[in-house]
Curated annotation (Swiss-Prot):
Pathway this chain belongs to: Cofactor biosynthesis; ubiquinone biosynthesis
Subcellular compartments: Cytoplasm
Assigned GO CC terms: cytosol
Residues reported to bind substrate: 76, 114, 166
Lineage, highest ranks first: Bacteria, Pseudomonadati, Pseudomonadota, Gammaproteobacteria, Pseudomonadales
SUPFAM superfamilies xref list: Chorismate lyase-like (SSF64288)
Family: Belongs to the UbiC family.
Role according to the record: Removes the pyruvyl group from chorismate, with concomitant aromatization of the ring, to provide 4-hydroxybenzoate (4HB) for the ubiquinone pathway.
This protein's name: Probable chorismate pyruvate-lyase 2
Length: 183
């Protein structure tokens, strides 16, 4: 069951109307977002942790991870920044049982990028990217805005699945317009 006002995550094939070409490119780029942001910022990239801890996962997250509703998992919320500006809000989740059995220490990442870890470990397989207009009330207070594009994908390694959602903030689009040669 979805929370009230929960988004309907869609693959590109079900997306209508399509966003503009630049937005579409950022949403469905299958490479490392960390690397792309690092390039856009001319190496002025950083990660600011906002929350890390055990929480009851949202129903849409449980469904995406094939977990029972109300399952507990590790939640990590961060800002991905370019030159100190929050460009992306990211929320990564994994079930308690899968993390405890796998040895991935999400609680030890600190200001390091989870994305880099996922892309450097070739044992992780990425599933299809899904997108939505992310619910405003799910964003941190300082970043709340209606209609922001978000994307998510699931990374699997054996019994471990990590769901990574990335919400593109207006400051990212400003940077993209200002530095098209870095995109």
């Amino acid at each position: 069951m979805q929370h009230t006002n929960a988004p309907l995550w869609r693959p590109q094939s079900e997306l209508t109307p399509l966003p503009d070409t630049s937005t579409l490119d950022w949403l469905f780029d299958e490479g490392s977002l960390t690397r792309r942001l690092t390039h856009l910022s001319d190496d002025g990239f950083s990660v600011t942790p906002l929350f890390e801890g055990w929480q009851t996962l949202r129903d849409d997250e449980c469904a995406a991870l094939d977990l029972a509703e109300g399952s507990e998992g590790w939640v990590r919320e961060v800002y991905l920044r370019g030159h100190g500006q929050a460009w992306v809000f990211a929320r990564s989740v994994a079930s308690r049982s899968a993390l405890q059995g796998d040895g991935l220490h999400m609680d030890e990442l600190g200001s390091r990028s989870l994305g880099e870890l996922l892309f450097c470990d070739h044992a992780f397989q990425r599933r299809a990217i899904e997108v939505c207009h992310y619910p405003e009330h799910w964003l941190p207070e300082g970043s709340r805005a209606a209609g922001l594009w978000g994307r998510r994908s699931r990374f699997d390694r054996g019994a471990l699945s990590v769901l990574v959602a990335e919400i593109f903030l207006p400051t990212l689009w400003e940077a993209v317009r200002a530095r098209p040669e870095n995109c």
